[in-house]
Amino acid sequence: MNFNRIVSIGDIHGDFKIFKRLLYMCNVIDKSGNWVGGSTYVIQLGDTLDGKRPGVRMSKKYAQESGELEIILYILILDSQAKLKGGRVISILGNHELYPHYFGDDKQFIRDYVKKSDIDVFKFHDIDRTTFLQPGNIGGSLLGRTRPLILQAGEFLFIHGSITDAMIKSNINPRTGKVDIYKINSDVSKWLMGKGKVPHYLEDTGKDNPVFSRVYSEAKTLNVNNCNRIRKQIDKFHNANHVVMGHSTYSSINTTCKRMLIRTDVSLSRAFGGELENKKLQALEILQNGGEPILNIITEMGKKPLK
């Protein structure tokens, strides 16, 4: 696989127009929305669902737009185009993809986090959104087939929240002593497709759950002891040196622990307020051509080194 150029995009929470604008900004789609990114790998870090926030005043225009189902389908279409050129478009699982399992049809949660416009699109297709997205049903199975929990591309690991010890301990390959990423994703896939039980580290929304944990991202700067502990976790993966994540919001893409951890969630979606025209967009670019990887922040004004 060619991982010379990776574009990583943080949480997009149901904002289809912002997602397409980000992809165009990163020079991987044209104005018609078709793939022009060649062998670039686009890795979106989860939380494509739930385009609303409690207490946040959305613009009327955004409130009337749907985006969830469009994003789900567009990722599949664009990935099929990218594969023909040696690239990929992959979205990993975030906590919001799994909320239909944890919260079901909790009416208060749905009122707080799901736009009526998105619910209406599912209804138009005679689909109950919550049921559709639960494990074992069509949408849950689709997520299980297409969205991994964790990815490795070169020396970079991609996960929504944080790597947890519970996930590591359950997935060590006894022959290599390293974490078996294939097993992790296979177990999660089987669960979401209704063919297996939920992995124990995903059973609840606690500290062992890698899509909910904020250990890697809750503090702007982690101390030396925390960084050393995280380094030991990363060393359990074959040839890994960095972890890229979303989940916790910042004003800009940033790093800590000497660039070992990279946080990409910058409240891209209009679910957090703002208009389409004034959102300040960012994506992470990773260039791996031998030697030390080059990290850039891509914006609509160009790109700058990530320090």
Annotated model-derived regions:
Residues 1-307:
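Feature recognizes metal-dependent phosphohydrolase scaffolds
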